[in-house]
Amino acid sequence: MSRVPSPPPPAEMTSGPVAESWCYTQIKVVKFSYMWTINNFSFCREEMGEVIKSSTFSSGANDKLKWCLRVNPKGLDEESKDYLSLYLLLVSCPKSEVRAKFKFSILNAKGEETKAMESQRAYRFVQGKDWGFKKFIRRDFLLDEANGLLPDDKLTLFCEVSVVQDSVNISGQNTMNMVKVPDCRLADELGGLWEHSRFTDCSLCVAGQEFQAHKAILAARSPVFSAMFEHEMEESKKNRVEINDVEAEVFKEMMFFIYTGKAPNLDKMADDLLAAADKYALERLKVMCEDALCTSLSVENAAEILILADLHSADQLKTQAVDFINYHASDVMETSGWKSMVASHPHLVAEAYRSLASAQCPFLGPPRKRLKQS
């Protein structure tokens, strides 16, 4: 659910004249999504104009607005008989009306959104009213196995809804002597110390390259570096650390994160950076890598990512990988990565099977939630 942000200081709202008084209006919008899977879709016997409805859903437990999706598998009328028709229906509403935008898509065999269609404006809904698309997708295209829209004869529809709520006005008065507090540049300034090797007091040797750093910053950010410098270890005595199992480019990205909290090249090296983050106990960087790897999950790499997650105790990534494998089990088990995992990591194969067996109902789709970052 979106929140009303604090209004920007008047001086930041415009570079032109500053008025004596001002008002900031925020239109509140609640956004939520819903996924509906229809099993054995090709066996639908509904005739033209007949309807299948989903269960009701809302944005949360306390939301009194109830919605559902409505599908006409063989079209709504003669004009749309060769299409699947799809609508969003307002089932119950305590108000006289609400306005909402919506977007429909189909999840393909890889869990990717395809064939998306969305409303061009916020439509007016009253209880019992629906809006949608009479010609959402041609039936022959949908049923063609080559298009991959019905894996295991399952049609998975994904709906995103944006409900317009009340607007909020925040107003105030300007004073003649406005003070603008500068933005905090701590991350940039610490990053400059790293990039320009200023006032350094230790050396880090990585793959034959020497990097200059600051013991205090390394110790504050990483418990592993802290232990090196705090105790009477060789690194503490010589102010020199040998790092043998991290590539130079990965190490530089890790150090940039240590100094700035940012990792601009993370997507290019998420697997190697995950290993480095695990070794040096950089928990936030580790979860950032898990999140990036979750977005790259595919049938081809799911087994490799599961092995990586298990090796580095990346629990959130491991859960997502197991769920993905369960959803795409028949395809994943044909890959070389899975066959290799069967031989090298049989305990992970057993975990995946236990997870699938313990499910109370068929898994409806790949997880879409963000990972929790510490």
Curated annotation (Swiss-Prot):
Pfam families according to UniProt: BACK_BPM_SPOP (PF24570), BTB (PF00651), MATH_2 (PF22486)
Pathway, per record: Protein modification; protein ubiquitination
Domain MATH: 31-161
Residues covered by region (Required for nuclear localization): 71-191
Places the protein is found: Nucleus; Nucleus speckle
PROSITE patterns xrefs: BTB, MATH
Gene Ontology molecular functions: ubiquitin protein ligase binding
One Gene Ontology biological process: proteasome-mediated ubiquitin-dependent protein catabolic process
Disulfide bonds: none
Keywords: Nucleus, Ubl conjugation pathway
Domain of life: Eukaryota
Physiological role: Component of a cullin-RING-based BCR (BTB-CUL3-RBX1) E3 ubiquitin-protein ligase complex that mediates the ubiquitination of target proteins, leading most often to their proteasomal degradation.
Subunit annotation: Homodimer. Part of cullin-RING-based BCR (BTB-CUL3-RBX1) E3 ubiquitin-protein ligase complexes that contain CUL3 and SPOP, plus a target protein.
Name assigned to this protein: Speckle-type POZ protein
Species, as recorded: Danio rerio
Gene giving rise to this polypeptide: spop
